[in-house]
Amino acid sequence: MPLLDSFKVDHTRMHAPAVRVAKTMTTPKGDTITVFDLRFCIPNKEILPEKGIHTLEHLFAGFMRDHLNGAGVEIIDISPMGCRTGFYMSLIGTPSEQQVADAWLASMQDVLNVKDQSKIPELNEYQCGTYLMHSLAEAQQIAQNVLARKVAVNRNGDLALDESLLNA
């Protein structure tokens, strides 16, 4: 099985919260797709709570689109990582890490402005596979943490995993 790009970076050297260009690719029609690693937690030291990450998934996708879409950028998807330390965001375009960081911080402020759980989008059994597994309070604590710590940039060159550690 091929080694995925996300496993070629040294997770012990990642900063969080931090944005990283995980991958870029060009479609046959010439569009650039960029995948960003939006790392909320320091790997193997912190983890996002399941209800909070789920609520954040519902809120973050819309708020990031509000702040980042336009001028050659269109978000395709924002999905939580299985390890619960962040999200992957795939988009058409090539925004800078700073543009993404600014949109992320603005989105976290938007999360703090949500007044109650009934305002979480798609919070019903028809649109959500686990609609009872939510916590606005946990999502807001995650947002507060990001705002307090700011958003750094993780660079692939700084995180390149030593080949001797691959499959260790």
From Swiss-Prot:
Its cofactor is Fe cation. It holds the Pfam family LuxS. Its EC number is 4.4.1.21. Binds 1 Fe cation per subunit. Keywords: Autoinducer synthesis, Iron, Lyase, Metal-binding, Quorum sensing. GO terms for biological process: quorum sensing. It is an enzyme of class 4 (lyase). It catalyses: S-(5-deoxy-D-ribos-5-yl)-L-homocysteine = (S)-4,5-dihydroxypentane-2,3-dione + L-homocysteine. Belongs to the LuxS family. Involved in the synthesis of autoinducer 2 (AI-2) which is secreted by bacteria and is used to communicate both the cell density and the metabolic potential of the environment. The regulation of gene expression in response to changes in cell density is called quorum sensing. Catalyzes the transformation of S-ribosylhomocysteine (RHC) to homocysteine (HC) and 4,5-dihydroxy-2,3-pentadione (DPD). Homodimer. PANTHER family: S-RIBOSYLHOMOCYSTEINE LYASE. This is S-ribosylhomocysteine lyase. It comes from Neisseria gonorrhoeae (strain ATCC 700825 / FA 1090).
